Amino acid sequence: MIGVGVMSKENKTMSFEQIFQEVKQRFSGTDVSQITDHLAYQFNITGESAGSFYVEVKEGRLHIEPYEYYDRDAVFTCKADTLFKIIEGKTDPVLAFTLQKLKVDGDIGKALRLKEIIANRY
């Protein structure tokens, strides 16, 4: 598992593809069956390894793909290191938003449900 930040095990900056694969791997097997609402998020990664991917909860299943999602509920924009801190539970998404390390656009109520997905990953 790669630690916080965007450095690989070889201390090289991770590409967007590597960041995406790491996120997808960390959430494989996440149980979202109790989430009955449709949730669709787009994540825009900024900085040297910029790119976009989406996370969707649909019919109790989690989908993560390296594409933009145009009919999304919310868009999260942050650097990769902030994203990994949130995923690892080292930074609360609300705190990251308050500290302006995470930008959120769209339905804030549905955006807050991201915490449910993260909590079910463990």
Task: Report residues per predicted region.
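Feature captures hydrophobic
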Residues: 2-122
